[in-house]
Amino acid sequence: MSTTGTTGPARPARTIFLLKFGLLLLGGLLLWPMTTAENAGAWGFYGHKRINRMATYTLPPKMFGFFKRHIDFISDHAVDADRRRYADPAEAPRHYIDIDHYAHGGQDPFALVPRRWNLAVEKFTEDTLQAYGIVPWHIQLVLLRLTKAFQRGDVDGILYYASDLGHYVGDAHVPLHTTENYNGQLTDQHGIHAFWESRIPELSADGYDHLLGRASYLDDPLDAAWNAVHDSNVRVDSVLGLERSINAQFPEDRKFVFEDRGRGGMRFYSREYTKAYEDAMNGMVERR
């Protein structure tokens, strides 16, 4: 889809209106969890596309018209950030933050890591922050770029940054994107990442409730991003612990099945095992 030369939303006189426009979009994205996923990216390619599409419907009427006209672009390009990971080495840290890396001696890492970027850099250095992920700060940066695109009346920029914003917000809602044990590799639970964010939604998303109300204005988008990370991180122990408990109840031949996905037989967690895990989490994946 080409947007060059397309007429963008009317440029209001005050910058604050443009900022509120972006903040409302961010509010909608934070409101919307995921719906379904494939084995790609934080929520899978399909999941990220669905998040962006459904977030559009939470926007107020003055915003909805513009984004509805471009909803296919916003949805299709929701996965661009994941595709860039293969070409841009700076991209990967934008999708996560291993906040538990900063927890020493039982201290609360959220009390140790400053929420403001400049203060965090002063305390830990930028190299350290980049090494362990920067997703909450990158959400703020993308929102700023989106706001500037509105100021310029740059339709291409608006759509580009709005698509990216949805992606990073979605990533911040994944518990395993907030821990060094992101794939269970430290607890002998290899593969739990894709299990949680892909297999469960794949089998259950049709039953999820997608009616989430309207987006609300965010006074402090950086705090909202950090709150999403915090809410994700407090669920890490449950994500890992409940899977260990379910695993102990299932023999290997009931835990996995082989399915033909056009590339020969591929091993997946069984429907029975997946349901047992999802039931134990009491709908966590849908809520996130």
Name each model feature, range by range:
Residues 2-5, 26, 53:
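Residue-level detector of alpha-helical transmembrane segments in integral membrane proteins
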